[in-house]
Amino acid sequence: MPSSTSPDEEDGLETCVLKVFDLDLKESNLVNPSNSLKAELDGSTKKKYSFAKKKAFALLVKTKQVPAPSYEFKGKRWRCCQQLFADQISIHRHVATQHAEDVYQQTASLLKQLTAALSASQSLTPTDKRSSPKDCLTPSQEVSAWLPDVSHVSPQELRSGQGDEEGEVLLYYCYCDLEDPHWVCAWQTALCHHLHLTGKIRIATEGINGTVGGSKVATRLYVEVMLSCPLFKDYLSEDDFKSSKGGSHCFPELRVGVFEEIVPMGISPSQVSYKKPGIHLSPGEFHKEIEKLLSQSSEEQGNTIILDCRNFYESKIGRFQGCLAPDIRKFSYFPSYVDKNLDIFRQKRVLMYCTGGIRCERGSAYLRAKGVCKEVFQLKGGIHKYLEEFPDGFYKGKLFVFDERFALAYNSSVVSECSYCGAPWDQYKLCSTPQCRQLVLTCSACQGQGFTACCVTCQDKGGKQASGPSQDSFKEECECTARRPRIPQEQQAQS
């Protein structure tokens, strides 16, 4: 079972937070400005450090400000981390203590902007100086210049998806070359705070990968800004944003960071590029391929593999009929899985799929680079887009998502079972042992009997802790996870 507290998991997307997911921003390869930032600067840039830090702090505080009804409060107020602040001292203290990392990120970005602006001003000709900055987005432009006007929207409309009221969760990615991911990081942080969005966003020189939740008004504004941004407008379309019912309550907070990869496969983008993926198939084309495959004889079916690129706990509760679903815990294990099982792909047509399409981009590129497959295809838009078009198609079960919802249901089929009694069941809960907190499938009847852990060891451990003195919770890998083969050896191509 995947741990909810492991900082190295990626897929990826939180009182019961799944910190193993795609967009988890606390893993060790996060590139962040640190307290040593000033010491690393050259002499001329170091002089601007204090100004940049103050401005970064002020900009972040400004994004937290919310209008106050005149009949209720005359001064300014700020909202952050589901708290309301009525005076500057308290919001300043909160930002300084709880969002220091964001301040450092934006400070580093502002320093780059100041340096670039100074360099540009010294080299511009009079003709250059007359050029409009709106023609092209450059690092010298302030983050605040790319925040949408929300004066026509009430604070209630922006925050309506935070409680029981229905909001929306967006899932998207965009592979494109970004020269200054730190600028994009600062901008995305400010943009999401501005629109009261929560979620997780990964940024790298190879692009951006995000999932954000908020009110429908806020998510629509977010899409509009992304589609109008010069960095992404030539690559993104409205169809690239997958939406589902939810809101900002689906995530405990906002996490935005700069990484080497926008989805961690564990291989540098310079070695395996998103620019050489498998052939994209629309949901309709993918549906026809599977329909044709399932109508063939067993011998003919052996020439094609439907490959699930997700983790085992995702495919466990939902998958395409006849697929090969690797029993791996992380996408970063996928390259090793391919290497270990290369023979099953030899001279085969491979139809790959994942949640939204992002893992297939580089996953298919890696498989193609091996040079053993006859053809490699991938589902454009992933399962998400397929289910929008074919809710009762060849995908059976639920779609796992990396937030507090755990899964989305598009059809009534149940393909998984209770870990204890074997009854049909597909509703994940977290292991009841605090140190473990892995995902477990245990039906209502078994939960009523006290079976709430991922395995017998955890069940016993949880019982002893409940009867003993309280102690601080600390992360601990479960024995059932430790016993799992890291990279399974497949005996046959089809399941």
UniProtKB/Swiss-Prot annotation:
The gene is Tstd2. The keyword Nucleotide-binding does not apply. Residues 300-395 form the Rhodanese domain. It comes from the Eukaryota. This is Thiosulfate sulfurtransferase/rhodanese-like domain-containing protein 2. The modification Phosphoserine is found at S268. The keyword Secreted does not apply. It comes from Mus musculus (Mouse). The active site is at C354 (cysteine persulfide intermediate). CDD domains: RHOD_YceA. SMART domains: RHOD (SM00450).
